[in-house]
């Protein structure tokens, strides 16, 4: 009788341990992510951050003009990184792994055409002038 009880208890313990492995991974309500987004100026910054923040579940978004990195805090229970990236490409900015449609890119302000090297160089020249004025 003791052997039967022992075997039955061992079976239950083994079964319950296996059931715990099957549980779904908990989603983080304050996940931090960062990735690269193409853009060149303050207007791009506002557009990129607004697109990210309008995504349900995004709590914080800030994009750096110099590094092109966006830092986001999101609730993974409400949204995904893929959704955020799609929303940013929908306003005309390329994200690593996703390219904005031509229609979306054409909708950005003429000074924000980050795919045009002349405009990018013009912005870089403006940044240098601003730095010299501050000194």
Predicted regions and their residues:
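Short amphipathic alpha-helical segments, especially helix-boundary/capping motifs
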Residues: 23-27, 44-45, 59-62
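Short acidic amphipathic segments
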Residues: 48-64
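Mid-chain, structured segments of secreted extracytoplasmic proteins
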Residues: 60-106
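Bacterial Sec-dependent N-terminal signal peptides
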Residues: 1-25
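Sec-dependent signal peptide cleavage junction
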Residues: 18-36, 82, 96-135
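Short, thiol/selenol-centered motifs that function as redox-active sites or metal-ligating centers
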Residues: 35-52, 110-114
